[in-house]
Design a protein with these regions (language model features):
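Active-site neighborhoods and metal-handling regions in enzymes and metal-associated proteins
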Residues: 1-409
Length: 409
């Protein structure tokens, strides 16, 4: 194994060698027979972790990897390597010393993507506290005068709410799951925008503000995007926002047969935009790890998403629309695939989604008459759940804001 995320998952360890993704730089050899070997800087392991792992695993320093591979190759061993994730140097050592190679996708990718009950419980807990932090942030933002907050200060404030909320709810914010995308006005139209002091701009009256952010907690990883109006929103912004919202809802509410792939569902998030001659130039959704990488495969919801969606997989649902030089819109929730109620009169097993993210969607940007009855019912039910789950953890000011933000359409 050469992917640190897979190694972290297989051995149930985490680290902090890099920002945003809690793994340690490491390698591993998994044998068909015999104990696995883990190659990791042992200074990164506490004594209790060393003692526990040593019962099942041979632990080496990373510098020992080439020597161990050489010994195995000299015994004519056959190695399975993921060609997309392994260095050419490893392949060369194996071949030069008499070993053979079988190209195989990382065997941990699929089981890692199918979350077990403990991982799903942790993800729900992580999203519960994340939802409270998001409500506190958007409540605070609604009370600020336009142009008194900028992209950097907004992102910093959101992180502080996450850290404070986690402590109040008996947890800890370990890290962000990626650098926050905090884009006001035309900056929101840059899909992977990263604010810096040179590009930082205020949140101005009459503009849209797009914030795509996520957190790493010990029990789960979050990723959420909301687009809100700063002051009054124009008619074109409302129209485009509602088209994006329709796609997000239609995918969230989908029921589909077993064997369905991500590419089979991608159109649900786009069809409303297509009817208006619009689209977005990115995938609709990606897999998400369990206190691991915020982008995780093999599942995606995209035009190239060939992996079957299986119960327990977490995927993002994030359609958008971006008008260059003017505004950007994206609405993102995380979903988990789960068995769905049978269709009355049907005769096949169906799957659907549970929404994990618990944060209001800006009602001020919705053209209600563009929604179908089913879409309106879905959003009202979602907002009722957001209110129920978040309200007990909010003070009076934030709770009153949430009551307004989640009023039925």
């Amino acid at each position: 194994l050469t992917d640190p995320s897979s190694i972290a998952w297989v051995f149930n360890i985490r680290g902090n060698d890099v920002s945003n993704t809690p793994f340690s730089l490491s390698f591993a050899i998994l044998r068909a027979k015999g104990r696995p070997s883990l190659f990791i800087d042992q200074r990164k392991l506490g004594e209790s972790e060393k003692q526990y792992l040593a019962r099942y695993v041979d632990i080496f320093e990373p510098s020992a990897l080439i020597g161990e591979i050489t010994k195995e190759a000299q015994s004519r061993a056959c190695f399975s390597l993921d060609g997309q994730l392994s260095a050419e140097k490893l392949r060369q050592v194996i071949v030069d010393h008499g070993g053979t190679i079988k190209d195989l996708r990382d065997p941990a990718r699929l089981p890692r993507a199918i979350k077990n009950e403990a991982e799903l419980k942790g993800s729900r807990q992580a999203h519960a506290r994340d939802g409270v932090a998001l409500c506190r942030f958007f409540s605070w933002l609604s009370r600020q005068k336009p142009a008194t907050v900028d992209e950097i200060s907004a992102a910093t404030k959101l992180e502080s709410f996450r850290a404070d909320t986690a402590l109040k709810m008996g947890s800890k914010l370990e890290d962000l799951s990626f650098d926050t995308i905090s884009g006001s006005g035309s900056d929101g139209a840059i899909i992977h925008y990263r604010v810096n002091t040179a590009t930082n701009r205020p949140l101005n009256e009459g503009e849209l503000y797009l914030v795509d952010s996520g957190a790493q907690y010990r029990d789960g990883t979050t990723d959420v995007t909301r687009t809100v109006a700063i002051g009054h929103a124009g008619g074109q912004e409302k129209l485009c926002f509602t088209l994006v919202l329709k796609g997000m809802i239609d995918l969230s509410a989908a029921r589909f047969p077993k064997g369905t792939r991500g590419q089979d569902l991608d159109v649900l998030a786009r069809i409303a935009l297509w009817k208006a001659g619009l689209d977005f130039a990115h995938g609709t959704g990606h897999g998400v790890g369990s206190y691991l990488a915020v982008h995780e495969g093999p599942q995606t919801i995209s035009k190239r998403g060939g992996q079957e969606l299986l119960p327990g997989m977490i995927v993002s649902n994030e359609p958008g629309y971006y008008r260059e030089g003017a505004f950007g819109i994206r609405i993102e929730n995380l979903l988990v695939v789960k068995p769905a109620e049978p269709v009355k009169g049907g005769d096949i097993d169906m799957l659907g989604f549970e929404t994990l993210t618990l944060c209001p969607i800006d009602r001020n940007l919705i053209a209600v008459d563009m929604l179908t009855n089913e879409e309106r019912e879905w959003l009202n039910a979602y907002h009722a759940r957001v209110m129920k789950e978040n309200a007990p953890h909010l003070d009076e000011v934030d709770r009153k804001w949430l009551e307004v933000a989640t009023q039925p359409l």
